[in-house]
UniProtKB/Swiss-Prot annotation:
GO molecular-function terms, A-Z: methenyltetrahydrofolate cyclohydrolase activity; methylenetetrahydrofolate dehydrogenase (NADP+) activity; protein homodimerization activity
Quaternary organization: Homodimer.
Catalytic reactions of this protein: (6R)-5,10-methylene-5,6,7,8-tetrahydrofolate + NADP(+) = (6R)-5,10-methenyltetrahydrofolate + NADPH; (6R)-5,10-methenyltetrahydrofolate + H2O = (6R)-10-formyltetrahydrofolate + H(+)
Alphabetized InterPro entries for the sequence: Aminoacid_DH-like_N_sf, NAD(P)-bd_dom_sf, THF_DH/CycHdrlase, THF_DH/CycHdrlase_cat_dom, THF_DH/CycHdrlase_CS, THF_DH/CycHdrlase_NAD-bd_dom
Transmembrane segments: none
Binding locations of NADP(+): G166, A167, S168, I232
Nucleotide-binding recorded as keyword: no
Listed name of the protein: Bifunctional protein FolD
Organism annotation: Escherichia coli (strain K12)
Entry keywords, A to Z: Amino-acid biosynthesis, Histidine biosynthesis, Hydrolase, Methionine biosynthesis, Multifunctional enzyme, NADP, One-carbon metabolism, Oxidoreductase, Purine biosynthesis
Family designation: Belongs to the tetrahydrofolate dehydrogenase/cyclohydrolase family.
Single GO cellular component term: cytosol
Function, as annotated: Catalyzes the oxidation of 5,10-methylenetetrahydrofolate to 5,10-methenyltetrahydrofolate and then the hydrolysis of 5,10-methenyltetrahydrofolate to 10-formyltetrahydrofolate. This enzyme is specific for NADP.
Length: 288
């Protein structure tokens, strides 16, 4: 079989258009536009590209985008002070600190300093805990974006045997929680997993997030499986590929995400959704 391509670019554009319409309706009703503060410390080239795409997406949907580009020499105390200021700013609904941070700054301390109601990346322990307890508020962007893709393609996940490859805090772990909520029987594999091939071959829904080009051979894929490739790897020849050998996997899967143009655009679209949610649910004046 030839797999159907899950077009993340198109779905992400739909999500962004929906958010833009809601923002226009807010402004027409006399409410303020949502505000997102994006903080970049240092000059990591990859981080600069990610940050630029997030800021552009913000402006496209009509958000107020605030940029804070701090030098590499910024101290942890200075960064925490900025976060405190943004936490107290009523015009800011979301605070995004681009990772990785320079050496000497504690990622965990910084992420925990962001108020949970402004944590639009969904990384704060409070928000992760809410997801674990089946009462999610702001959800980690990549896992939530993947669930949106599955929903928009009307893929019924209940009862599927789902396998997540990679147990990172950003994708793998929260993804496993989203899949449990979506009714899957969920396995998470990691570097200590024995016989990885066995797990892959039994997956109805496979989500791969390890950051290694071609890590999963196409002939491991179960016939008719749904394959979600989160990896974004740039080869020496400049080509961008995923963690799955796409051409071979696409011959066996029923659905597959391409790289680029699959999961990546959904991460930014979900960040935009989260910022609107934070604005409407947590920061708008609530009717008594």
């Amino acid at each position: 079989m030839a797999a159907k391509i899950i077009d993340g670019k198109t779905i992400a554009q739909q999500v962004r258009s929906e958010v833009a319409q809601k923002v226009q309706a807010r402004i027409a009703a006399g409410l303020r536009a949502p505000g997102l503060a994006v903080v970049l410390v240092g000059s990591n080239p990859a981080s600069q590209i990610y940050v630029a795409s997030k800021r552009k997406a913000c402006e496209e949907v009509g958000f107020v985008s605030r940029s804070y580009d701090l030098p590499e020499t910024t101290s942890e105390a200075e960064l925490l002070e900025l976060i405190d200021t943004l936490n107290a700013d009523n015009t800011i609904d979301g605070i995004l600190v681009q990772l990785p941070l320079p050496a000497g700054i504690d990622n965990v301390k910084v992420l925990e300093r962001i108020h949970p109601d402004k944590d639009v990346d969904g990384f704060h322990p409070y928000n992760v805990g809410r997801l674990c307890q089946r009462a999610p508020r702001l959800r980690p962007c990549t896992p939530r974006g993947i669930v949106t893709l599955l929903e928009r393609y009307n893929i019924d996940t209940f009862g599927l045997n789902a396998v997540v490859i990679g147990a990172s805090n950003i994708v793998g772990r929260p993804m496993s929680m989203e899949l449990l909520l979506a009714g899957c029987t969920t396995t998470v594999t990691h570097r200590f997993t024995k016989n990885l091939r066995h797990h892959v071959e039994n997956a109805d829904l496979l989500i791969v997030a390890v950051g290694k080009p071609g890590f999963i051979p196409g002939d491991w894929i179960k016939e008719g499986a749904i394959v979600i490739d989160v990896g974004i790897n740039r080869l020496e020849n400049g080509k961008v590929v995923g963690d799955v050998v796409f051409e071979d996997a696409a011959k066996r899967a029923s659905y597959i995400t391409p790289v680029p143009g699959g999961v990546g655009p959904m991460t930014v679209a979900t960040l935009i959704e989260n910022t609107l949610q934070a604005c409407v649910e947590y920061h708008d004046p609530q009717d008594e």
